[in-house]
Amino acid sequence: AVPCATWLDGLSEGEQAIDELLGLLIGKGAAALNVIPDRNWNIADPETRHLKVQKLHAIAKMAGALDLPLNVGTEMNSPGNRLVDDFAAPAMAPLNGAFMAGAYFIYGHTVLQSTRGWGYQSDWARTHLPARRARNAFYETAGRRATPGEDRMRRLFDLPSASSPDAVLNALAYDY
């Protein structure tokens, strides 16, 4: 698992001291930040929408500066919410790159953890990728390359257990 800090909307007392809060959570092991974007832009009141969109953009920028990939999604446990976020909405479009990078990061971690036990928190990752920025970049790249398919997964299984990150990415490389 990738320990995720969470962010609601930046309005609570704790989230108003977000630098301090994220510093504490990173110190406790948080490696990504979970946000639910829809509740921060899909709001009828224009003033509230403007404020929450500003805060959403600010937290996305801060997450990037702190090397915290963004994990985004909807609140499917609440009636009336979307099944999938609308990343093309004007308020969301500027964040699309960060949202997709976070999705690839999570997918890369999931593929490598489930196939080889080489997920983000693994001994393998800590040995080969001790710096958070390099580790994040590796798992994002792995996620971009890890297209579904038996052949690609077999290549991962065939790697020696002491394989380097470059060898792993090469095993996931496109065939064309």
Predicted regions mapped to residue ranges:
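Charged catalytic cores and adjacent phosphate/nucleic-acid-binding surfaces used
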Residues: 1-176
